[in-house]
């Protein structure tokens, strides 16, 4: 205890962080990890597991021949933005019909309606404008929209098995974590034959930690993830993100709609533009944050886990769920600025998305994930009663089963001729 206090006093005097993440000198493969230099001096550790038994090409070709025309979904919706910030989403196709969207897991329900009217939803609440219901329908139709976006495309969503050589799973962690939080998922899916990729964000795990705040902005981190994605991506890629990592999955799905086949968002929150809070404990000086680090770790344990027993403390420690220097933590929180990632940005996504929410999560309220389910086009929301923010550590078997069922899910083929006739 005295040693810990002394270390913090020395830190306040010298500004040097004990046990901080140091630079990685190699950019080669080591102990099953890749160290990739995405920019000069910016090296990320990546866990890349290749299947021990590559998929049978003949079996894949036979599967493709049998199911080549299946899983075709017509994604059609009109997104209207009004000048008072209100948003109206009309699903014009039959994409969200329950007979088309179904999973092997009977508990999964498709989220969405044929017409949704939504007010501006920001991190500060709904104060931006009046409610849509307060305006008479006749007057509402006469309003001149600020912007109208038409989404009209076809996607082929297929079953993704571990034996398929064109499938890669990407796992992206959030603030304070590392790729170690995915240990159970990486082991489970690699044993099923999937190729898996999990990076450490810069400043986290064994990646380098630049001592400049600009290195931790959303845009800098997003470009890192773009480099990782372009390095390992194949024909069908599935992105799995947790917390802040969900934002990077959303970014990649928007940037590469033809390469991102499915997305899983675990406790990612609502479809809101990112903006750092002005009144936050993370705006305090780094030395003060360092002195408060034991309190922050305890607060994370309380808010991130449904229980706070010995097992959870061990998971927190061994999973590196919250193990980052005070400088990196402060820079990460203040760098979360992404105005483009608003409701419209999310509404434009046509990729199938699974939302996973831990019922006891104190960081992300349930209504935020429900809001996300309303905005997205093809989505399922699954609530895990026993889990919290770190649900992949608390309930690994449940999460693994849920993810696997979603990977295997394939929608029934739509009758596009009948649908187009109905729309006319």
Swiss-Prot record:
Q: Which GO terms describe its molecular function?
A: carboxylic ester hydrolase activity; lysophosphatidic acid acyltransferase activity
Q: Which SUPFAM superfamilies match?
A: alpha/beta-Hydrolases (SSF53474)
The enzyme class is hydrolase
Gene designation? abhd8
Record GO biological process = lipid homeostasis; phosphatidic acid biosynthetic process
**UniProt family annotation:** Belongs to the AB hydrolase superfamily.
Q: Which UniProt keywords apply?
A: Hydrolase
Q: What is its EC number?
A: 3.-.-.-
- Pfam families per UniProt: Abhydrolase_1 (PF00561)
- Organism the protein comes from: Xenopus laevis
Q: An example Gene Ontology cellular component term from the record?
A: mitochondrion
Highest taxon above the source species: Eukaryota
Catalytic site residues? 243, 361, 389
Q: Where is this region: Disordered?
A: 120-143
| Stretches assigned to the AB hydrolase-1 domain | 168-270
UniProt-recorded name of the protein: Protein ABHD8
């Amino acid at each position: 205890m005295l040693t810990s206090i002394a270390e913090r006093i020395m830190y306040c005097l010298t500004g040097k962080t004990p046990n901080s993440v140091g630079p990685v000198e190699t950019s080669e493969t080591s102990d099953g990890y890749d160290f990739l230099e995405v920019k000069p001096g910016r090296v990320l550790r990546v866990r890349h597991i290749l299947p021990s038994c590559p998929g049978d090409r003949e079996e894949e070709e036979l599967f493709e021949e049998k199911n080549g025309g299946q899983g075709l979904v017509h994604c059609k919706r009109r997104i209207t933005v009004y000048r008072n910030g209100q948003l109206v989403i009309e699903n014009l196709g039959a994409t969200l019909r329950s007979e088309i969207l179904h999973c092997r897991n009977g508990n999964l329900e498709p989220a969405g309606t044929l017409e949704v009217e939504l007010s501006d939803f920001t991190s500060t609440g709904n104060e931006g404008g009046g409610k849509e219901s307060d305006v008479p329908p006749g007057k509402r139709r006469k309003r001149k929209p600020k912007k109208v976006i038409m989404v009209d495309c076809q996607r082929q969503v297929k079953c993704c098995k571990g034996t398929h050589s064109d499938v890669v799973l990407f796992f992206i962690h959030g603030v304070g974590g590392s790729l170690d939080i995915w240990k159970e998922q990486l082991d489970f899916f690699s044993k099923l034959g999937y190729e898996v990729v999990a990076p450490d964000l810069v400043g986290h795990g064994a990646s380098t930690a630049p001592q400049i705040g600009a290195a931790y902005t959303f845009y800098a981190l997003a470009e890192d993830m773009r480099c990782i994605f372009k390095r390992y991506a194949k024909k069908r890629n599935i992105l799995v993100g947790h917390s802040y990592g969900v934002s990077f999955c959303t970014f990649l799905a928007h940037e590469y709609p033809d390469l991102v086949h499915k997305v899983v968002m675990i406790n990612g929150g609502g479809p809101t533009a990112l903006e750092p809070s002005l009144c936050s404990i993370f705006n305090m000086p780094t030395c003060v944050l360092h002195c408060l680090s034991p309190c922050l770790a305890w607060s994370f344990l309380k808010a991130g886990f449904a229980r706070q027993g010995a097992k959870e403390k061990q998971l927190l420690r061994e999973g590196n769920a919250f193990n980052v220097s005070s400088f990196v933590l402060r820079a990460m929180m203040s760098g979360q600025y992404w105005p483009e990632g608003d409701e419209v940005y999310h509404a434009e996504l046509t990729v199938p998305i699974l939302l996973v929410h831990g019922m006891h999560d104190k960081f992300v309220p349930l209504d935020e994930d429900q809001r996300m389910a309303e905005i997205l086009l093809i989505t399922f929301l699954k609530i895990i009663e026993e889990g919290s923010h770190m649900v992949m550590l608390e309930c690994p078997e449940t999460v693994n089963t849920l993810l696997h069922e979603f990977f295997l899910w394939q929608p029934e083929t739509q009758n596009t001729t009948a649908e187009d006739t109905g729309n006319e």
